Amino acid sequence: MTEKNDLFEQNVTSQNIMVATHVQSSIPSVSRSKFRSLTLINWNGFFARTFDLDELVTTLSGGNGAGKSTTMAGFVTALIPDLTLLNFRNTTEAGSTSSSRDKGLYGKLKAGVCYAVLESENSRGQRVISGVRLQQIAGRDKKVDIRSFSLQNINENQSVISILTEQVGEKNARVLALNDLKEKFDGSEVQFKQYHSITDYHSFLFDLGVIPKRLRTSGDRSKFYKLIEASLYGGISSVITKSLRDYLLPENTGVRQAFQDMESALRENRMTLEAIKVTQSDRDMFKKLITESTNYVSADYMRHANERRGNVQQAIEKRQEWYQSKSKLTLEQQRLVEFSREMQDLEQGESSLEAEYNSASDHLNLVMNAVRHQEKVERYQDDVAELNERLEEQQMALEEVAERQEMAQARATEAEDQVEELRSQMADYQQALDAQQTRALQYQQAVNALEKAKQISGLANLDLHNVEDYHAEFVAQADEITDKVFELEQRLSVSDMAKSQFDKAYELVCKIAGETDRLQADSVARELLSAYPSQKAHAQQAVALRQKLTELEQRLHQQQNAERLLAEFNQKAQAELENAEDLESYYEEQQARLEDLEAELAEFVEVRSTQRQQREQLNQQYQQLAQTAPAWHTAQSALARLQEQCGETFDSSQAVMQFMQNTLSREREATLERDELARREQLLDEQISRLSQPDGAEDIRLNQLAEKFGGVLISELYEDVSIEDAPYFSALYGDARHAIVVRNLEAVKAQLQQLDDCPENLYLIEGDPNAFDDNVFKSEELGDGVVVQLSDRQWRYSKFSEFAVFGRASREKQLEKVKAERDETTEKHAERAFDVQKCQRLHQHLSQFVGTHLALAFQPDPEVAMQEIAQKRAEIERELNQASGTEQQLRHQLENSKAQLQLLNKVLPQLNILADETLQDRVEECREQLLEAQEDEQFIRQFGNALAQLEPIAVALKSDPTQFEQLQADYKRSVEQQKLQQQKVFALADVMNRRLHFSYQETVGAEGSALNEQLRQRLDNAQREREQAREQLRQATAQFSEYNQVLTSLRSAFDAKNQMLQELLQEMDEYGIRNDDGAEERARIRRDELQQRLSQHRMRKSYIDKQVAVIQAEMDNLNKAVRKAERDYHTQREIVVQAKVSWCLVLKLSRNSDVEKRLNRRELAYQSAEELRSISDKALGALRTAVADNEYLRDSLRASEDSRKPENKVVFFILVYQHLRERIRQDIIKTDDPIDAIEQMEIELSRLTNELTSREKKLAISSESVANILRKTIQREQNRILQLNQGLQNIAFGQVKGVRLVVNIRDTHAILLNALSNDREQHSDLFENQKLSFSEALAMLYKRVNPHIELGQRTPQTIGEELLDYRNYLDLEVETFRGADGWMRAESSALSTGEAIGTGMSILLMVVQSWEEESRRMRAKDILPARLLFLDEAARLDATSINTLFELCERLDMQLLIAAPENISPERGTTYKLVRKITNNQEYVHVVGLKGFGRV
């Protein structure tokens, strides 16, 4: 892909017109192609007729229906055989209907095969026969079938009719079908060709110069047909004038195609970049696939390798475990024999210890029960005494509360009666209606009170006169009774105290001696008190006796313990040692033996500790090496990969560093070569850009200056020179080959001073650009150069250069060479860029290796040292295992010696006790004395407090207080009399208080109100007293109830405690023991000692029993373990054998596929199975996603998940490698290893990305360049239109004296051009946006600068493509100069018919000439196309107009076919008279041809 100028300006020059006469003189003269004849076969009226066509004008003259239109229709059909276009409107023959698909052609044919054939002669002198075969198709639609064909290499003397027909007899002929025609020329020099498409047919006609334009599409055919149709029917065709730009202005397909190619290249470039991104993602996917598959398979591979190694190790361990179990079983059998013997001895001594322990335990329980009973008795005695005191106190308090309650009850009753009486009085007073009634009521109440007092006192004669005397008497009696009550109360209190003392003393006697008669209580008390001092003295001696007994029992116990220990020692030592000397000597022997064993064991332990330290050191070294080993293996893998990438073998780190320096040097050299090639490529691109300029201008400023001066570059004038002439003209002009040809140098001179930017040397030549003469210099060819005389004194000699700027052909030839060199340079640059990136990547790998692995890569293999350490460690382990048995024996002997020494240490201090033989008798005697003292102590403890209380009050037992009940009854009677007397006193006092009421009998009415008030006050006072009495009664009642409840609870508690006390005393009597303070402790000590001995004995027995059971169980387990170990060993060995088969298959697959190196990653061998499984599982999850779209790999991956077949994983890895190998582009990447391919792919993709990015910058075109191209193209077309106008200057038809074309630039598009060239920075946001194509940016700019224009629903891409067509920037109009109106727009309504026909013909001639110029580059250089137009109904033209047409045809070397009625008689050309005749019922057209008959 070249630069922008090569894209957009290479085809602009196709529209240049050869106007310089010196250029034409340099090119050999080429004659124009001509139509020679028209042949119609089997048409309506023409069975076989050939019309020879004149070189200028051929006229068909005849009346209506003579066949003129049919002849022209045959010509048009042979020229354009397209049924979609053919439409002969002016025909009236039968068969032409509006619904017929032949559009008037069906009726012009006869049944059978028909032909319309054109014979022409091109510029090369070749005879070309082309035409169509027509045939009617039966049916209502009246279709016509058309087949086009051509013939070449036909002899000149052979007519067309003889070719298409075959004579049958003397007077008949047969029309040949196409197949017959083809068979006729098979094997001959004649080239017959039938065309299956109209495009191929027209391409043939164009290539041989029959038609002026290559008709590629139906649109081109439609234009050509409309041009023929317009010329046929005459006049100004509105179809052509409305789209005059499409006809006159050539479609600059080169520029549009160049723009499309540029956009397509940019789009392709960007798509390639996107594809590179996709490829990079694919590369990442490949990289991920190979990485994850390697992790997936290698982790499983190493896990199986570790498992296989572990299985072998386990098999060895199982075998060792089997042998160890056997040795353990033998040792346990020996231990079982020893423990069984000791067990028998322990069973014999256990029974005696159990009996002693049970006896001591029973004695302790008895003592503890006695102590607990004694404690309970003492506690209950204290509780009973306390409760008795509290009961007496509560009884006295209850009696006081009962008295207070009775008094409160009496006061409450009296207050209640008084309130009721006052209420009744008040009720009576309230019922009275007046004061008299009230007093009467009071009087009545007084009378009632008197009657009540009489009843209470029993005095019938009581009245107001003696009430005071009786009241005084009753008060005295009440005082007397009160004194008596007080006296009785005192006597009752004293009597109560005496009774309580007697009762208490009696209770104490009964408590001590049991139930006793009240009369004998005094004698029993004296007996108890007389024996009390002696019992108390005996009780005090119990403590000393108890201590003495304790000491004796302890010595006895020590003696028994010593005897037991001595017996146990003799049993264990298997000796009969009894005296102290033997024991001491034996002790010294055992002490010396113990020291020897301890020294030997310490030395042994020290040696074993040293071995363990060595083992720990070896383990640490092994661990360090194990930690270093993965990194070392990783470094080795990296080193191997680096050696593969470098193609070198490194022996040391210095070699790596040296190679790294060499790589850096190679990178610098390759970088210099790459940069040099890049500069060379840039120079070649610039040269290509200059050669791609349409006019050969090497400096863009020359084009701008030529446009500014209104001139033309001289190289543009010589654009069409041949390759042979280009060196001559280039040498002729020398440095002036880039000169500008201007019309007037003086006019340009004034503008030179205002130039800001121009080349260093600017050459200007005066001359007419449209008719430039090369006689500027006097020159003469001299050998391989030319001598140019610049002046009389200055000549210049220039040699013919190999490459000349002049001429498009020369530049194109040089452009091909430069492009070839550029392509070669580009390829070399790509290779060097790849080498640079390869060196950079290699240097990066080296740097990464140096930074990460260099420190470990060249160190020795840690696994070798690990194997040596493992051997040493195994030897130490063997020694430690052997030493373990020896140490166990030493420790067993040491424990036996220590146990004997411990027993001796216990026995030796007690040898003196063993000699005391009277110890047992003294213990028994002291125990009897202690029992007597304990009985007295128990009696004193039980009844000592009672005797102490009885001693001061024992005198009260002498007299029994039996009169207490009589005194209590008298006291109660006196209290009743006191109450009755108080009621009498109260009744008499009430009468005395009412004495005033008795006087109300007569004077009631005067004092009622005061009495009522007095009653109310009394009632209020009485109610308050009643409430107080009630409250006091409630309080007294509550207090009495509370005291009564307390008394009841105390009495219940006293009874319960007393009963329990009696029961406890009875139980103590039943036990028959008396406790002292140390009895329980001694019994417990004795019991604990025996319990400890028994416990130790049982513990030892239990231990021995357990040991026996453990040994038996251990032996059972060992038997099972031996069998299991043997079974496990054989099972493990089978596993090893089976795993070996599978492993051999895996190794075979990996080695045959050359993937073992990838899978055997030793750095993974030091990870656990779980870690490896985790790596494999993670990789499996990633692989499931990666191969989801690949059914083959997906199935293989699914099969590889079977853990029973590890070889499937290797198969999957091999398939992945094959899959990646198949996707390696061998033309790009020269390797079979996918990993190396990924590395090279990264380098290649990086290089392509850089190259495409720079290529995109080169492909981009600036808006200013587009504006210049469009402006230059528009200027050239304007110049061409100007030249076309010059050919129409002398045309005159009627009043029309001239015809011209007017071309203008549209205002909206002119604004767009200005914006493209002048406002680049302002609109850079559009053209620098990579998301927009150039066409879309151009459309958006057009909308931005012309916001008033509505673009409709078209897309920006479509609008932009239209704006790249310069024709859309121009408006074309046809103007005529007619009479006094001057120049005006050509319209049919403003012209006569003849004027319109002539004007239209002039326009059509311009179109044909424009088409020729447009297609000049697509034709051969030695061919000029034929020019032919039609004119039907030429009778509209006068003779002058006809002559004008003849002149126009002669001047433009054009042929004209005219159809005119009989009154038309042209003076020149060939005229055919057509007359339709009927002979023998056969219709035919009689044709007579004449040349120039008008002048005859």
Curated annotation (Swiss-Prot):
Residues 326-492, 534-632, 863-942, 1005-1171, 1235-1291 form a coiled coil. ATP binds at G62, G63, N64, G65, A66, G67, K68, S69. Keywords: ATP-binding, Cell cycle, Cell division, Chromosome partition, Coiled coil, Cytoplasm, DNA condensation, DNA-binding, Nucleotide-binding. GO terms for cellular component: cytoplasm; nucleoid. Residues 694-811 are annotated as: Flexible hinge. Its main location: cytoplasm. SUPFAM superfamilies: P-loop containing nucleoside triphosphate hydrolases (SSF52540). Pfam families: MukB, MukB_hinge, SbcC_Walker_B. GO terms for biological process: cell division; chromosome condensation; chromosome segregation; DNA replication. GO terms for molecular function: ATP binding; DNA binding. It comes from the Bacteria. InterPro entries: MukB, MukB/SMC, MukB_hinge, MukB_hinge_sf, MukB_N_dom, P-loop_NTPase. It is found in: Cytoplasm, Nucleoid. Homodimerization via its hinge domain. Binds to DNA via its C-terminal region. Interacts, and probably forms a ternary complex, with MukE and MukF via its C-terminal region. The complex formation is stimulated by calcium or magnesium. Interacts with tubulin-related protein FtsZ. Plays a central role in chromosome condensation, segregation and cell cycle progression. Functions as a homodimer, which is essential for chromosome partition. Involved in negative DNA supercoiling in vivo, and by this means organize and compact chromosomes. May achieve or facilitate chromosome segregation by condensation DNA from both sides of a centrally located replisome during cell division. The hinge domain, which separates the large intramolecular coiled coil regions, allows the homodimerization, forming a V-shaped homodimer. PANTHER family: CHROMOSOME PARTITION PROTEIN MUKB (PTHR42963), DUF4476 DOMAIN-CONTAINING PROTEIN (PTHR42963:SF1). Belongs to the SMC family. MukB subfamily. This is Chromosome partition protein MukB. The lineage of its organism: Bacteria, Pseudomonadati, Pseudomonadota, Gammaproteobacteria, Pasteurellales.
